[in-house]
């Protein structure tokens, strides 16, 4: 299971985290959220073409309605904010592809593992790369160790561990039972 876990870890967590951070520095977060709503459509397309899934007409219609809404919101946003760097939207699109790919991988290749095992394994795979990014980003050099900074770091860490990890466990379980 390590190969699918490795792929799921990087496509669903590692790269999208950075892609979103870079993208929202250049485009509105609302645009990134709208673009991220393409994930169900991309999930269906990847599932159909690469994993052999079939879908009901109702499912396809629902995703199509969502796509039309997404396109309308993107066009309106571009009219309202024409001076943004919309080429960064490609990073959001790549994240959606990563999410879609990982959803299909969890459903097909990791369905025999429980959701907690998938989550723990993915975060274990990402520990070293994430630590390397943290070290080489200058985080430890730039951090001023005060009581407020330590407290803030504690709460961010708590949010990451409790919020993100628990959400990933629940999400992985929902993917498995869908």
Features from the language model and the residues they span:
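Hydrophobic transmembrane alpha-helices of multi-pass small-molecule transport proteins
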Residues: 46, 55-77, 96, 130
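Hydrophobic alpha-helical transmembrane segments in multi-pass integral membrane proteins
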Residues: 15-22, 71-81, 126-142
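Specific transmembrane alpha-helical segments of multi-pass solute transporters/efflux pumps
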Residues: 1-36, 72, 160-178
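Structural signature of hydrophobic alpha-helical transmembrane segments
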Residues: 22-40, 85-98, 151-161
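Membrane-interface helix caps of multi-pass small-molecule transporters
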Residues: 18, 22, 26, 45-54, ...
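Residues that define the loop-to-transmembrane-helix transition and helix capping
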Residues: 3, 30, 56, 116-117
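Hydrophobic alpha-helical transmembrane segments of multi-pass integral membrane proteins
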Residues: 7, 58-68, 87-91, 105-162
């Amino acid at each position: 299971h390590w190969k699918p876990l490795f792929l799921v870890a990087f496509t669903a967590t590692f790269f999208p985290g950075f892609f979103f951070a870079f993208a929202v520095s250049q485009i509105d977060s609302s645009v990134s959220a709208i673009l991220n709503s393409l994930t169900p459509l991309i999930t269906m397309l990847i599932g159909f073409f690469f994993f052999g899934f079939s879908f009901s007409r109702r499912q396809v219609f629902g995703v199509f309605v969502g796509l039309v809404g997404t396109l309308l919101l993107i066009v309106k946003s571009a009219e309202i904010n024409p001076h943004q760097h919309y080429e960064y939207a490609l990073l959001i699109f790549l994240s959606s592809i990563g999410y879609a790919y990982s959803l299909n991988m969890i459903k097909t290749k990791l369905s025999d593992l429980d959701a907690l095992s998938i989550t723990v394994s993915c975060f274990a795979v990402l520990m070293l790369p994430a630590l390397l990014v943290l070290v080489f980003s200058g985080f430890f050099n730039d951090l001023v160790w005060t009581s407020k900074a330590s407290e803030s770091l504690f709460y961010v860490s708590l949010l990451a561990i409790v919020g993100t990890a628990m959400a990933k466990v629940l999400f992985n379980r929902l993917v498995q039972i869908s």
